[in-house]
């Protein structure tokens, strides 16, 4: 009888692994295919990350450097087409699902691990994120690796502390939100102390050593990245806004899917009362959600800012759904998310190039279109009227033209009269210090004339348009300029 029970357990374990591998391989291949076929232009942030990848550094204005290193690696392998810039995204999400499986298996059992990994892999947020590249992608990968390493270190010690330190350090080099992991770790030690003090110090020392180059870079640049991160929170203009809070809560339901959200909420309410692993996992969920819920109430918060909560959240949600009194709960929740993921892929492929299907305000893809068209027109002007550098007025146009104005990377400088540094281009290039014999100005018509007057020679060439959707386009005036004479002395803008 005992051998029969073991055989049944092994059979269930093997079947579970087959389900997981099928989901991992099937969804990853599908996402890679959609990625390659996607008609979407690079989003402004993606184009900026690509530009960073051409200029290796230990830090950048708004983010730590790992995203740039990651893109440099993938584009070195497959080239710098849009899908090459985004290639790491579906692959790292698959890796994150693998670590979620390992963490769920270590805390509970293989069945829970498989269920949790499939929950993570099918989250609508992951389905959409797999078609883009962002700092959330490596953050989630290293967060999940750190979670698994911490579980193993608490259970077995030894070299797992080194793995924890490695994951923590690389996570901090991916996104500063990795610091929330330390709060979860502290929560776990207070609720269920098991850590070796020596092991914890080893992990922290490794993490600190890996992160140190970015700290040094920030010190050399006035801690500009930390300043930008704090400004993102916009606490200076804080005020109570219930509408922002409700919008953020709705966005979290959309991020994980309604079924998974209900499973997670049920688990958060009921399981910690009798489940030690659940109490421990809450440390990696609650602080993130509570912080951003509070921020949403007083200043607003982007939907993706709380995404790290859903690594541990996938495990807890899977556990809650599997233990639900209604047995099909897990399958229904995952099935709904699979349909949502397919809808996202279908929308990208079918509507990615259609700029007039939605009213402009309701178009979810409007910021991922039109840049290639603008870049092609600017490239033609550069060929007809040779110019060494492109001058623009804003970060979005600067990032997009660096990628889409050929040959890439186009030498782009942003108009920035003396004043606060607001972006990467303000930090890295001062128009007055850039030696360019000839410039191509790409600017809104109402600003271009005043800017052209600040050069000793200027020639109006024409206008170009960037499709915006809903039969609208943004117009840019094109000038050829020579010899910058300096910014206006009184007015901060032309």
Question: Where does each model-flagged region fall?
Answer:
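Membrane-proximal, lumen/periplasm-facing interface regions of secretory-pathway glyco-
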Residues: 303, 327-386, 395-411, 416-423, ...
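Short acidic/glycine- and proline-prone juxtamembrane loop motifs at membrane-interface regions
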Residues: 125-139
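Transmembrane-helix signature of polytopic, membrane-embedded enzymes
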Residues: 2-4, 10, 18, 100-122, ...
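Transmembrane-lumen/periplasm boundary regions of multi-pass, lipid-linked membrane glycan transferases
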Residues: 181-277, 284, 288-293, 299
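Specific aromatic-rich, kink-prone transmembrane helix
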Residues: 99, 119, 138-155, 163-167, ...
